[in-house]
């Protein structure tokens, strides 16, 4: 029974996407920020518990990255629709995720392997994205943070979008193109 705790935490993070997005739409950015930080901390907690107590499950390995992606995309769209992030930036982020999603699906279908795991640049991209969302919500809540902090975080996200996509295309993309040629 205790072994289900990481999956329960992950499921809660999955469900938090809805209130986070709603609070951003309503302009209740501080509450959205609080829930977003809680969701982010839960990501570390579920992974820690699963590894420490060997509560790793196939379901958890599937659900955890899905919950992370829903949290990021849900928050991204809410920030876009409330004009807290520029649309060109949102399209760039969604395009990156689309490239990785299509590539991962092709890789899985062609090689029947999930070896196309997130690379270190993708993990940095996620970290910078989370930092950006926190900065945007902090600025919207308190208006005391200078806008250049957002620009620095956006530059970091863009940098890791480029690195992660190039790295992905050089490795998994090369194998996919060899297979279909």
How would you label these PLM feature ranges?
Residues 1-181:
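Alpha-helical transmembrane bundles and membrane-interface segments of multipass inner-membrane proteins
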């Amino acid at each position: 029974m205790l072994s289900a705790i990481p999956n329960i935490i992950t499921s809660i993070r999955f469900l938090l996407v809805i209130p986070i997005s709603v609070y951003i739409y309503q302009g209740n950015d501080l509450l959205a920020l609080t829930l977003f930080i809680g969701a982010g901390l839960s990501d570390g907690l579920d992974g820690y518990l699963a590894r420490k107590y060997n509560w790793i499950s196939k379901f958890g390995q599937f659900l955890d990255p899905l919950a992370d992606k829903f949290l990021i995309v849900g928050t991204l769209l809410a920030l876009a629709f409330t004009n807290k992030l520029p649309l060109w930036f949102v399209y760039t982020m969604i395009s990156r995720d689309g490239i990785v999603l299509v590539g991962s699906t092709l890789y899985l279908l062609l090689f029947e392997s999930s070896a196309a795991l997130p690379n270190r640049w993708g993990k940095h991209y996620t970290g910078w994205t989370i930092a950006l969302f926190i900065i945007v919500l902090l600025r919207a809540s308190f208006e005391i943070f200078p806008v250049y902090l957002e620009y620095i975080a956006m530059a970091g996200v863009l940098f890791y979008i480029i690195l992660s996509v190039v790295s992905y295309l050089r490795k998994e993309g090369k194998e996919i193109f060899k297979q279909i040629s």
